[in-house]
Swiss-Prot record:
Its cofactor is a divalent metal cation. A motif (Nudix box) lies at residues 47-68. Belongs to the Nudix hydrolase family. RppH subfamily. It is an enzyme of class 3 (hydrolase). This is RNA pyrophosphohydrolase. SUPFAM superfamilies: Nudix (SSF55811). Its EC number is 3.6.1.-. The lineage of its organism: Bacteria, Pseudomonadati, Pseudomonadota, Alphaproteobacteria, Hyphomicrobiales. The keyword Manganese does not apply. Residues 8-159 form the Nudix hydrolase domain. GO terms for biological process: nucleoside phosphate metabolic process; ribose phosphate metabolic process.
Length: 175
């Protein structure tokens, strides 16, 4: 059996989807072993990078597979890969015990479509739903809504993309 400290990080992407008012899409996750309470069940779309796939392509694919959204314009990305560890108590059950956490590349995009495009119950490509509901949320609230072990990543994402929320609203006429 591989020791927790020797496990690799799963290569993933995350997507901050901003609407015309500069608010961020968050989805309420379906139940999972990593959830600690009902407050920390919200997150932005994220997912794994397939072998040979570049991160930006993976981010667009994951966004579509989780939300049905394709109408986006890239605003920015975080140069660094952000890393988090999952708690040791769930590491053996999460991802079949193959990873100790995730290594994520984060992107910010402007949503150029209409809210009717968003479908988390029957998402794009016939993929299994990961969210049961969704809403637009002020960016500064995001770290308090995510499971605690992901909070440092969300704090960094919010810090890096804070100006983009204002820009998204200005460009779209929302601010």
């Amino acid at each position: 059996m591989t020791r927790y400290d020797d496990l690799p990080y799963r290569t993933c992407v995350g997507m901050m989807l901003l609407n015309a008012e500069g608010l961020v899409f968050i989805g309420r996750r379906l139940g999972g072993i990593e959830h600690v309470d009902e407050t920390h069940v919200w997150q932005m779309p994220q997912g794994g990078v397939d072998p040979g796939e570049d991160p930006w392509t993976a981010a667009k694919r994951e966004l579509y597979e989780e939300t049905s959204v394709r109408s986006v314009e890239k605003l920015g990305e975080i140069a660094d890969w952000l890393i988090y560890d999952i708690p040791r108590t769930v590491a053996g059950r999460s991802w079949k015990g193959r990873y100790r956490g995730q290594r994520q590349k984060w992107y910010a995009v402007r949503f150029t479509g209409d809210d009717s495009e968003i479908d988390v119950v029957s998402p794009g490509g016939g993929h299994k739903a990961e969210f049961i509901s969704w809403r637009w949320e002020p960016m500064q609230n995001l770290p308090d809504l995510i499971v605690p072990f992901k909070r440092p990543v969300y704090e960094r994402v919010v810090k890096e993309f804070a100006a983009l929320a204002k820009d998204a609203a200005k460009v779209s006429g929302g601010g």
